[in-house]
Amino acid sequence: MADSSGRGAGKPATGPTNSSSAKKKDKRVQGGRVIESRYLQYEKKTTQKAPAGDGSQTRGKMSEGGRKSSLLQKSKADSSGVGKGDLQSTLLEGHGTAPPDLDLSAINDKSIVKKTPQLAKTISKKPESTSFSAPRKKSPDLSEAMEMMESQTLLLTLLSVKMENNLAEFERRAEKNLLIMCKEKEKLQKKAHELKRRLLLSQRKRELADVLDAQIEMLSPFEAVATRFKEQYRTFATALDTTRHELPVRSIHLEGDGQQLLDALQHELVTTQRLLGELDVGDSEENVQVLDLLSELKDVTAKKDLELRRSFAQVLELSAEASKEAALANQEVWEETQGMAPPSRWYFNQDSACRESGGAPKNTPLSEDDNPGASSAPAQATFISPSEDFSSSSQAEVPPSLSRSGRDLS
């Protein structure tokens, strides 16, 4: 801005070439000029030197500056009285006596409202001077417009932040209230279902009561008939119970029918009952004691029988063991006296014995020492029962002492 003003003061407009070059320079200056922010700096305006021919314009600017300064003072007074009170909602109660000295005229609604008509007037007025004085007239208006836009932007930002905070608080409260309403709705639904169930149950009970009343009214005349039928049915059941075990009489000759037989049997049973009543068999205390003694005797007999069975089983087991031991002793004595040849004939075949011995003759005659009681006939591969040979040998060669001991064991 200083360079442009210097050029306008040092080089006056002479000739058409200068006017065209001035227009070009004016356009270039308007496109590349940088305006600094003058937020809250209305009183610190830089004064610029104007040429001698522009005295009326400077006077107009001074008058406008004085008018603007008076308007700024008024807006400051209004903002100090009203604006400060509007923006002190977050301060403490003790701060009300000494409010802070804050200059909030740039973001106050009243100052904005007052400045907007002047800005519109100043922007609408176009300077009718030369191209060198045009940038000096437009620069204050543009700076004021920029300041106004910045103040409005700040105000809108504050309002948006406040709205967001309020919206978050409202959302939290709405969610809380919605949760409470949902819980209350569930409770009311449960209560409604319970009341509906009770209503349906009462209706069913009422319907059943009406049906029962109608049935009672219809069946009340049949009460006497039902009582008589009950007595007859009880008599029939008793008769059926007494005659349900009756034997078939198809193959038995009876004089008369079954009813006559039952009458005669009933007469005999009555006679038996009378005789037993005369003898007092069923009501005496002695019979009760005898029955108790009989039950005790029965229990003792069962226990003794069980013990006898156990002892008899043990005796049989001992007898079997003794017989086994006696047989083993007799077998051992016989084997000692006879040797190993006879047992080999009992338990092994002659052919297999010859094969095991490695090609020995199959029909080998036994010597008289091996079998003294046998004849001199040729020996054959025959199997002799061990019990028969054992009994014969034991009778022939067992000493009497061993046989006596065996009989004692057996």
UniProtKB/Swiss-Prot annotation:
Residues bearing PTM N-acetylalanine: 2
UniProt keywords (A-Z) are: Acetylation, Cell cycle, Cell division, Coiled coil, Cytoplasm, Cytoskeleton, Microtubule, Mitosis, Phosphoprotein
**GO biological process: what's one of them?**
spindle assembly
- The coiled-coil regions, if any, are 156-208
Q: Could you tell me which residues carry Phosphoserine?
A: 105
A GO molecular function term, named singly, is: microtubule binding
Q: Where is the composition biased (Polar residues)?
A: 373-384
- Locate the region Disordered: 1-104, 118-143, 353-410
CC terms in the record's Gene Ontology section: centrosome; cytoplasm; cytosol; HAUS complex; mitotic spindle microtubule; nuclear microtubule; spindle pole
For bias type Low complexity, the affected ranges are 385-394
Location in the cell reads: Cytoplasm; Cytoplasm, Cytoskeleton, Microtubule organizing center, Centrosome; Cytoplasm, Cytoskeleton, Spindle; Cytoplasm, Cytoskeleton, Spindle pole
Matching entries from PANTHER family are given as:
AUGMIN FAMILY MEMBER, HAUS AUGMIN-LIKE COMPLEX SUBUNIT 8
- What does the subunit section of this Swiss-Prot or TrEMBL entry state? Component of the HAUS augmin-like complex. The complex interacts with the gamma-tubulin ring complex and this interaction is required for spindle assembly. Associates with microtubules. The interaction with microtubules is strong during mitosis, while it is weak or absent during interphase. It is unclear whether this interaction is direct or indirect. Interacts with EML3 (phosphorylated at 'Thr-881') and TUBG1.
What does the function comment of this entry state? Contributes to mitotic spindle assembly, maintenance of centrosome integrity and completion of cytokinesis as part of the HAUS augmin-like complex.
Regarding protein family, the annotation reads: Belongs to the HAUS8 family.
- Tell me the protein's name: HAUS augmin-like complex subunit 8
Q: Which organism is it from?
A: Homo sapiens (Human)
